[in-house]
């Protein structure tokens, strides 16, 4: 039997591999989300200027 078993049942190497994939996927998602917000802001800003929406 193993001395150190994990709750999830995955090995340390598998956990590190999953973590690397998760982090890179999350960073890709964040890049897409930030780009979408920048494009939406350029199209139609959601905070009015000093003179309001006019």
From Swiss-Prot:
Intervals, Cytoplasmic compartment: 1-20
Any one of the GO CC terms: plasma membrane
Chain positions recorded as a bacteriochlorophyll binding sites: 19, 37
Membrane topology term: Single-pass type II membrane protein
Keyword Chaperone set for record: no
Compartments (UniProt record): Cell inner membrane
Gene Ontology biological-process entries: photosynthesis, light reaction
Transmembrane annotation, as ranges: 21-43
Record's keyword terms, sorted: Antenna complex, Bacteriochlorophyll, Cell inner membrane, Cell membrane, Chlorophyll, Chromophore, Light-harvesting polypeptide, Magnesium, Membrane, Metal-binding, Transmembrane, Transmembrane helix
Periplasmic side: 44-54
PROSITE patterns: ANTENNA_COMP_BETA (PS00969)
Record GO terms (molecular function): bacteriochlorophyll binding; electron transporter, transferring electrons within the cyclic electron transport pathway of photosynthesis activity; metal ion binding
Role according to the record: Antenna complexes are light-harvesting systems, which transfer the excitation energy to the reaction centers.
NCBIfam families per the UniProt record, alphabetical: pufB_517_ASD
Subunit structure as annotated in this protein's UniProt entry: The core complex is formed by different alpha and beta chains, binding bacteriochlorophyll molecules, and arranged most probably in tetrameric structures disposed around the reaction center. The non-pigmented gamma chains may constitute additional components.
Family of this protein: Belongs to the antenna complex beta subunit family.
Protein name (database record): Light-harvesting protein B-880 beta chain
Species classification: Bacteria, Pseudomonadati, Pseudomonadota, Alphaproteobacteria, Hyphomicrobiales
